Design a protein with these regions (language model features):
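N-terminal metal-binding scaffold of metallo-dependent hydrolase/deaminase domains
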Residues: 1-2
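Metal-associated gating/positioning segment near the N- to mid-region
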Residues: 11-75
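Divalent metal-coordination and catalytic microenvironments
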Residues: 12, 23, 44, 48, ...
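Alpha-helix-loop-beta-strand connector modules within alpha/beta enzyme cores
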Residues: 16, 65-86, 130-141, 290-296
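Active-site mouth loops of central-metabolism enzymes
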Residues: 22-35, 56-58, 84-97, 116, ...
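Short, acidic/polar
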Residues: 33-43, 93-104, 179
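Histidine/acidic residue-rich metal-binding segments in metalloenzymes
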Residues: 99-264
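His/Asp/Glu-enriched, well-ordered alpha-helical/loop segment
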Residues: 162-188, 257-258, 263, 269-318
Length: 318
């Protein structure tokens, strides 16, 4: 009787845990023409991603109990992967009125963020942190000063000058991080910087890690690419935060290796073709990335930039 057991030769192979991607934008509800739960889960599984943390930047915004119920139901019915939703820090992502963390916590929300928006008002941010501490809620901040990054398209510097585009300075990121970590000394809530992009930010984190408790993420785009890859107006590399210098990229890799950066994400934000086939300044910001997260990370391993064990840690132990 032939055996029904099947054997697979795994010599010189790795068994990689399912990846947890902590920064994913799904188009449902409101932008299904860009992405829905079915297409998201297919792309995720193709890239080895089994769990995603979704951002609240939908239409309507995920900022109330009914929208959370809808999102979880759609994820359960249409997705083949684990969906962990976040809700917005402020009502309607407007950066004005703080959301109701207590009610949303009961619905299983794992964290609060305004996604691509930054809490600009310092007084509001202090209230958010105080409430988050009281309710053990996780605050996730996209660090970028709006006034300094207004109308910005690419990293501020030689590429911006060459292409004739408005630049986004690295200190636009630095200022928000410094402000929030200063507030964190008093309020001590659970706090996560969604993604950093510059050497200056790495230095701040290095100096503050022993003072306050927080975590930090980085996009695989900023680990693998630099501003030169934009070339002649490649709109699919119009990202937020922008790709910066090679020195910044190497500093981010160093931050991973020195345990200063905790999480590697895809920053998966698919846009439809019509939104990208425009001039660079008019094109939408964002790119699909969930399928390429693992291949790009493994390239960093193969070229000796980051150990495989560290990549696994940053992409599965979130």
């Amino acid at each position: 009787i032939p055996s029904r057991e099947k054997y697979t030769d795994l010599k010189e192979k790795f068994i990689f845990p399912g990846i947890v991607d902590m920064r994913v934008f799904v188009g449902e509800p409101g932008y299904e023409y860009k992405e829905n739960f079915r297409t998201l889960s297919n792309a995720a599984l193709a890239g080895g991603v089994t769990s995603v943390v979704t951002m609240p930047n939908t239409s309507p915004v995920i900022d109330n109990v009914s929208m959370v119920d809808f999102l979880k139901r759609r994820g359960r019915d249409k997705s083949k992967i684990n969906i962990f939703p976040t809700a917005s820090l402020t009502k309607g992502l407007e950066g004005t009125n703080m959301n109701e963390f207590g009610l949303l916590n009961k619905k299983g929300i794992i964290g609060y963020t305004d996604g691509t928006q930054t809490i600009q008002n310092t007084r509001l941010m202090s209230r958010i942190m105080r409430s988050a501490f009281d309710l053990d809620a996780l605050v996730i901040q996209h660090a970028e000063d709006n006034e300094l990054s207004k109308d910005g398209q690419v990293n501020d510097g030689i590429i911006a000058t060459k292409l004739g585009l408005q630049g986004i300075p690295d200190y636009a990121e630095k200022i928000i991080i410094e402000r929030d970590l200063t507030l964190l000394e008093d309020f001590n809530c659970r706090y996560h910087i969604a993604q950093i992009s510059s050497e200056k930010s790495v230095e701040i984190i290095k100096n503050r890690k022993e003072i306050v408790k927080f975590t930090t993420g980085v996009s695989i785009n900023n680990l693998s690419l630099n501003q030169n890859d934009i070339g002649d107006f490649r709109t699919f590399l119009k990202l937020s935060p922008p790709l910066r210098t090679e020195e910044d990229r190497l500093s981010l890799i160093k931050g991973i290796n020195q345990n200063l950066i905790d999480v590697i994400v895809s920053d998966h934000k698919p846009e439809d073709e019509e939104s990208k086939r425009l001039t660079f300044s008019q094109a939408a910001t964002g790119a699909s990335g969930i399928e390429t997260l693992l291949p790009l990370a493994l390239e960093l391993f193969h070229n000796g930039s980051i150990k495989l064990s560290k990549i696994i840690e940053c992409m599965t132990c979130n």
